[in-house]
């Protein structure tokens, strides 16, 4: 007799869902890391590139402040994207946790059914051995 799990296809789907949720989380974390790197780079750029010389013309002054303003707007935009991605990451972690929970539940069910199957087979084997022993005992007398 061979054990076959009656919900094998469901378990397979649960494992697939877990793998997909894990991939989605990985992509979101990569995006978040990229934005964090962009923020760090932009902050460094702002610190080094915008050291204003003492004497500048009005045009150079205006360009300097316009560039500084655009860099700060970009920094604000990146921080906003970072917050949004942080929320998406937390949401995705919740989905992954749920997928893992469902998969583990199916694996536990499979384990229980397999244990019950093994016990049933062992019980049937024991009954057969007992029957054989009884027949041998009765045939001797």
Where are the language model's segments positioned?
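Charge-rich amphipathic alpha-helical interaction elements
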Residues: 1-141
């Amino acid at each position: 007799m061979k054990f076959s799990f009656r919900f094998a296809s469901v378990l397979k789907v649960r494992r697939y869902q877990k793998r997909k949720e894990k991939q989605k989380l990985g992509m979101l974390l990569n995006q978040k890391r990229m934005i964090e790197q962009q923020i760090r780079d932009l902050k460094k750029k702002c610190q080094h590139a915008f050291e204003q010389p003492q004497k500048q013309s009005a045009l150079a002054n205006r360009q300097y402040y316009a560039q500084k303003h655009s860099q700060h707007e970009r920094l604000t935009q990146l921080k906003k994207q970072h917050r949004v991605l942080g929320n998406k990451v937390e949401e995705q972690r919740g989905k992954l946790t749920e997928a893992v929970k469902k998969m583990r539940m199916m694996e536990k069910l499979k384990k229980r059914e397999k244990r019950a199957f093994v016990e049933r087979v062992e019980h049937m084997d024991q009954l057969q051995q007992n029957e054989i022993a009884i027949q041998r005992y009765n045939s001797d007398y």
